[in-house]
């Protein structure tokens, strides 16, 4: 999330809109790469400073893994998503993993070679990023140009506002396990985690649809098509919901190896999220952000976060089911807010 810093939404929109206007595309790519390069240097400085100031075990591992962080920050996945060529992202990820596996087989033979792992992992990531930048510059003839400071600041501020909304979303998603572990029990965390993964798997097709449609809608501003897709995806989500409920006992038995039976009930409770997610995913980036309603997008996320904080106060009083109910309430409110904003 920190590596993306909101550019996976804002930069994708800009690239999609101006992919055929060469000077604007050069300005967008240059601004984003300059910002991300400075951001990368800043993060590396923080890492080195922290390692020097604090007594951190295995310092060398942190340093060696930093190559992967650099690759993640500089990887132009946002560019390829914007021009609707996601196949390249798949190719680059495949190349990274392939290079990593080959190098690992060649160089790692015992526990004493453990430092090779982060080195090779970083090399694989850096190779994929370098190849991605090469394709962007050579095949699509993108050029780095001088950019006015106000344009750089503008893109940074807009991406930062999206990053803040992502923070709210991340807190909502990640803090459930922390609260359950601290106030209810680690066993419940395990049940919740398995059930949540099954439900998220059910939402995965809609997430992919969001990634594919967002740049197309941002480029063509074809919101009528988007609403047709939403109607279809809504009924598909209901079908997946039914399958999730039907197959929950089998899925929990398979993934939990017969030890996580209480997760079945949690899947039943959380499975309606598949339907609400189908609306939230497609109303958020593809409609609100594509139409330029960044403020409405951010406000909706922080309103949901406020409701989440209010609901979490009851975790101390009640139990796991209170937590699950609060998640459903938050998603329903978020869904209604997105729908209201999109209708306006």
Where are the regions a protein language model picked out?
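Residue-level recognition of transmembrane alpha-helices
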Residues: 36, 65, 93-97, 118-122, ...
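Membrane-water interface segments that mark the loop-to-transmembrane alpha-helix transition
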Residues: 4-52, 222-244, 295-300
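Conserved small/polar residues in nucleotide/adenosyl-binding loops
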Residues: 338-344
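Interfacial segments at transmembrane-helix termini and the short loops linking adjacent helices
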Residues: 51-65, 246-277, 325
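Helix-loop junctions and terminal segments of transmembrane helices
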Residues: 3-20, 199-221, 284-290
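Residue-level recognition of pore/gate-forming positions within transmembrane alpha-helices
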Residues: 40, 69, 97-98, 122-129, ...
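Transmembrane helical elements of multi-pass membrane transporters/channels
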Residues: 89, 93-100, 116-137, 149-215
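Membrane-interface junctions at transmembrane-helix termini in multi-pass inner-membrane proteins
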Residues: 69-92, 219, 274-302
């Amino acid at each position: 999330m920190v590596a993306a810093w909101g550019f996976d939404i804002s930069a994708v929109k800009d690239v999609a809109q101006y992919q055929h206007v060469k000077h604007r595309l050069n300005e967008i790519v240059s601004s984003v790469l300059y910002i991300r390069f400075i951001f990368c240097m800043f993060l590396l400085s923080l890492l080195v400073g922290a390692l020097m100031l604090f007594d951190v075990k295995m310092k060398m591992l942190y340093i060696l893994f930093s190559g992967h962080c650099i690759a993640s920050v500089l990887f132009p996945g946002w560019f390829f998503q914007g021009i609707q060529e996601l196949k390249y992202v798949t190719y680059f990820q495949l190349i990274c993993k392939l290079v990593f596996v080959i190098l690992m087989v060649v160089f790692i033979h015992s526990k004493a070679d453990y430092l090779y792992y982060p080195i090779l992992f970083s090399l694989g990531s850096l190779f994929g990023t370098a190849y991605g930048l090469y394709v962007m510059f050579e095949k699509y003839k993108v050029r780095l140009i001088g950019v006015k400071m106000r344009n750089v600041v503008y893109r940074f501020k807009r991406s930062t506002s999206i990053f803040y909304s992502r923070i709210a979303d991340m807190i909502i998603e990640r803090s459930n396990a922390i609260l359950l572990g601290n106030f209810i029990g680690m066993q419940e965390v395990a049940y919740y985690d398995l059930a949540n993964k099954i439900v998220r798997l059910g939402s995965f097709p809609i997430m992919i649809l969001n990634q594919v449609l967002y740049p197309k809608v941002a480029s063509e501003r074809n919101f009528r098509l988007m609403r047709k897709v939403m109607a279809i995806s809504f009924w598909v989500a209901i079908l997946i919901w039914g399958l999730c409920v039907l197959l929950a006992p089998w899925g929990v038995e398979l993934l939990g190896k017969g030890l996580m039976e209480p997760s079945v009930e949690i899947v039943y409770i959380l499975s309606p999220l598949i339907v609400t997610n189908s609306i939230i995913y497609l109303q958020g980036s593809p409609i609100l952000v594509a139409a330029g309603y960044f403020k409405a997008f951010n406000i909706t996320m922080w309103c949901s976060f406020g409701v989440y904080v209010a609901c979490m106060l009851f975790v101390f009083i009640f139990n796991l089911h209170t937590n699950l109910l609060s998640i459903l309430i938050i998603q329903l409110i978020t869904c209604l807010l997105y729908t209201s904003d999109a209708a306006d």
